[in-house]
Amino acid sequence: MNIQPNTFFLKAMLTLLNIKGNNMCWAHKKNMFERFTEKAVKVIMLAQEEARRLGHNFVGTEQILLGILGEGTGLAAKALKSMGITLKDARIEVEKIIGRGSGFVAIEIPFTPRAKKILELAIEESRILTHNYVGTEHLLLGLIKEGEGVAARVLENLGVDLPKLRSNIIRMIGETSEVSVGATSGRSKVPTLEEFGTNLTQMAVEGKLDPVVGRAKEIERVVQILGRRTKNNPVLIGEPGVGKTAIAEGLAQRIINNEVPDTLEDKKVITLDVSLLVAGTKYRGEFEERLKKIMDEIRMADNVILVIDEVHTLIGAGAAEGAIDAANILKPALARGELQCIGATTLEEYRKHIEKDAALERRFQPVMVEEPTVEETIEILRGLRDRYEAHHRLKISDSAIVAAAKLSDQYIADRFLPDKAIDLVDEASSRVRLMNYKLPPSAEYLDEELRHIQKIKNELIRSGDFEEASQFREREIEVKVQMAALMKAKKEAIEEELALNPPIVNEDDIANIVSSWTGIPVSKLTKSESEKLLHMEETLHSRIVGQNEAVIAVSKAIRRARVGLKNPNRPIASFIFSGPTGVGKTELTKAMASYFFGSEEAMVRLDMSEYMERHTVSKLIGSPPGYVGYNEGGQLTEAVRKRPYTVVLFDEIEKAHPDVFNLLLQILEDGRLTDSKGRTIDFKNTLLIMTSNIGSKVIEKKGGGLGFELEENIEELQYSRMRNLVNEELKQYFRPEFLNRVDEIIVFRQLTKDEVRDIAHIMLREIFERVKQQGISLQVTERFKNLLIEEGYNPSYGARPLRRALVRLLEDSLAEEVLSGKIKEGDNAMIDVDENKQVKILLGNSNNQHAFLA
């Protein structure tokens, strides 16, 4: 494509080249430089930057060479790189030959006569090759042809054979001309479009596209719409990751395989990059000119199907103040059938942008692309397996493919098949490959030495000691050669090993990636984890005293979920913990979060006393549009979306507004909830626990009844009666449809004196740990413990009075002693009680022979 530089650049260029004269001369020279491509212009700009960097007040052939290497993407740069020339090496060589300048550089840096000659020779080379543009390749050909400047010396010093380089460039120019299918005189019929797009048909011919499995129905519909006389523009609408772009690739593959009707034979499918089309349009009218040029080329070629991914970006693209956007420019051509265009966008973007513009909407024919099923995803993964095996150089087992489809469907709720399953296979393959590849120790040593040499060399260059720097450069080359030989040998050994015994991606590798993405343990149970799950009750009882019914129910639910036997469409379990205050309802939930979900912070705790008012209910799922906090998300939905494997605690559930219970119905039944932004949040891997104090009065009375009962059964009979009475009270407070969805209602027992004694042990142990961190060793006597239990036991209030007694009897006394300086770091203290039940603190070894609680 011929990129025309703006007039300002041309005038600046001619000034720098010291070209002066009458208007005729200006017009002639202007025409000469108008043929420079954007990349060639960039080379000239970079050459001036290189001159400034070196402190030179001229632009010579060497700066043009550095500009070619700095541009990096043109044919000339590719030709130099293929011969092992890098910008870094060239800069060092240039500095060795001409050194650095004084540092004073004029604003306008003139070109040397030899540099001017190179530009003229570049234009001459372009004319000889019958090209109507001057690119970076012509600049390099001119530089080689001139052959006597500093640039030529630099190339020769770096070991380049100039005639061989010239023949390489000519060959590369010939190859790029041949790539354009159906072109006349070696040029494409749609040069502008190919500059701003990607030819999918050509990529299909070269085998660069992934195979498209399934989607026959959608491709057939697209072909039907493309065959229409007018408004022949399908738009593929579907969720992100369902395979919309793959349908366009599938069409390109069908065209090259002659599996399309005669109306689509010999068509070229080209994707347009809208962002690239807009990029660089600094002046008004440039964008419109590019787009009109593309439309004219498509109209003239008459064999192009344009694909615009993210088609909603057309709306507003290029629309500066008072200008027309891309969508409005394309509308007439889309309606008349002059332009066959396949668009692709998501449901949300289609609704937000295209449906608003009725005139644009009627020009596109919607084709809905649904998410494939798990079975279809497995087939898609099998079709792609060869590509991923070749890329990662390993084998992907059938079990890994099935696991990727099933586990991604079950555990990754916020993305869509097949994209999430493909990503799982890709990342698992990458992980297996990395685990099987390690650098040899000798290579690591050489790499460290190379970095050290390069650091010293760069310091010497900065200080101007080029002679010594050249010695280090020679050493650098030696180390690089050694490393290359070592790496080559290692690579060959690895390739040989991989060819004989390629690593295999299996089900466990996929499960590990799912776990790392979501935090949900889905890998196979290890022996230690199985033991941990089997003895779960014992683990919980180390922190929770009594309450066997609750501990057993929770443990069973966790075991079911971890083994994979739970219902995949419901939460792990849902419980109502009812009972008197202070008996361990919330503590059990904390213990479970700590031991089996990673930490206490893994628990999502919602104090329902904060949701007593009707207007606070929306805080759970997020504020509606137009209200404060709309963009912040819901306190419940956002917490579960970020951590899908967790315990959700609704503390003091009876204090919530009744609307909260309506919100919980679909969570309890289907394990899902839609937030204020329309996103579906997955609760299928959460454990839901609701605590309640309903029935506290009944529990306080212990459900006592009339009649005679055996002494050994009295406690169980009282508990049974109490549980029935609590259930009756719950039925009076909660609606039947809410209670019916809860898995189990667990009534906590009142704490006995022995259980309070055990809780005292746990609380004292925690205090000992806190004091130990300050360097103080603490012990208590049996007398003190008896006093603590006597003052802290209250059946109606559970363990909380014990905590208050502990603060009053132990912590307050101890704090006073520490502040007064009587107890210092390194001391041993013992807490005892005298005859008047007054707490006393003894230091050091005591003669009292009381038993200590450790």
Curated annotation (Swiss-Prot):
<keyword id="KW-0150">Chloroplast</keyword>
<dbReference type="InterPro" id="IPR019489">
    <property type="entry name" value="Clp_ATPase_C"/>
</dbReference>
<comment type="function">
    <text>May interact with a ClpP-like protease involved in degradation of denatured proteins in the chloroplast.</text>
</comment>
<dbReference type="GO" id="GO:0009507">
    <property type="term" value="C:chloroplast"/>
</dbReference>
<dbReference type="Pfam" id="PF17871">
    <property type="entry name" value="AAA_lid_9"/>
</dbReference>
<feature type="binding site">
    <location>
        <begin position="579"/>
        <end position="586"/>
    </location>
    <ligand>
        <name>ATP</name>
    </ligand>
</feature>
<dbReference type="InterPro" id="IPR036628">
    <property type="entry name" value="Clp_N_dom_sf"/>
</dbReference>
<keyword id="KW-0934">Plastid</keyword>
<dbReference type="Pfam" id="PF07724">
    <property type="entry name" value="AAA_2"/>
</dbReference>
<keyword id="KW-0677">Repeat</keyword>
<feature type="region of interest" description="Repeat 2">
    <location>
        <begin position="111"/>
        <end position="175"/>
    </location>
</feature>
<comment type="similarity">
    <text>Belongs to the ClpA/ClpB family.</text>
</comment>
<dbReference type="InterPro" id="IPR028299">
    <property type="entry name" value="ClpA/B_CS2"/>
</dbReference>
<dbReference type="GO" id="GO:0034605">
    <property type="term" value="P:cellular response to heat"/>
</dbReference>
<dbReference type="InterPro" id="IPR041546">
    <property type="entry name" value="ClpA/ClpB_AAA_lid"/>
</dbReference>
<keyword id="KW-0547">Nucleotide-binding</keyword>
<feature type="domain" description="UVR">
    <location>
        <begin position="447"/>
        <end position="482"/>
    </location>
</feature>
<dbReference type="InterPro" id="IPR018368">
    <property type="entry name" value="ClpA/B_CS1"/>
</dbReference>
<dbReference type="Pfam" id="PF10431">
    <property type="entry name" value="ClpB_D2-small"/>
</dbReference>
<dbReference type="Pfam" id="PF00004">
    <property type="entry name" value="AAA"/>
</dbReference>
<dbReference type="Pfam" id="PF02861">
    <property type="entry name" value="Clp_N"/>
</dbReference>
<dbReference type="GO" id="GO:0005524">
    <property type="term" value="F:ATP binding"/>
</dbReference>
<dbReference type="GO" id="GO:0016887">
    <property type="term" value="F:ATP hydrolysis activity"/>
</dbReference>
<keyword id="KW-0143">Chaperone</keyword>
<feature type="region of interest" description="Repeat 1">
    <location>
        <begin position="36"/>
        <end position="101"/>
    </location>
</feature>
<dbReference type="InterPro" id="IPR027417">
    <property type="entry name" value="P-loop_NTPase"/>
</dbReference>
<feature type="domain" description="Clp R">
    <location>
        <begin position="33"/>
        <end position="175"/>
    </location>
</feature>
<dbReference type="InterPro" id="IPR050130">
    <property type="entry name" value="ClpA_ClpB"/>
</dbReference>
<keyword id="KW-0067">ATP-binding</keyword>
<feature type="binding site">
    <location>
        <begin position="238"/>
        <end position="245"/>
    </location>
    <ligand>
        <name>ATP</name>
    </ligand>
</feature>
<dbReference type="InterPro" id="IPR001943">
    <property type="entry name" value="UVR_dom"/>
</dbReference>
<dbReference type="InterPro" id="IPR004176">
    <property type="entry name" value="Clp_R_dom"/>
</dbReference>
<dbReference type="InterPro" id="IPR001270">
    <property type="entry name" value="ClpA/B"/>
</dbReference>
<protein>
    <recommendedName>
        <fullName>ATP-dependent Clp protease ATP-binding subunit ClpA homolog</fullName>
    </recommendedName>
</protein>
<dbReference type="InterPro" id="IPR003959">
    <property type="entry name" value="ATPase_AAA_core"/>
</dbReference>
<dbReference type="InterPro" id="IPR003593">
    <property type="entry name" value="AAA+_ATPase"/>
</dbReference>
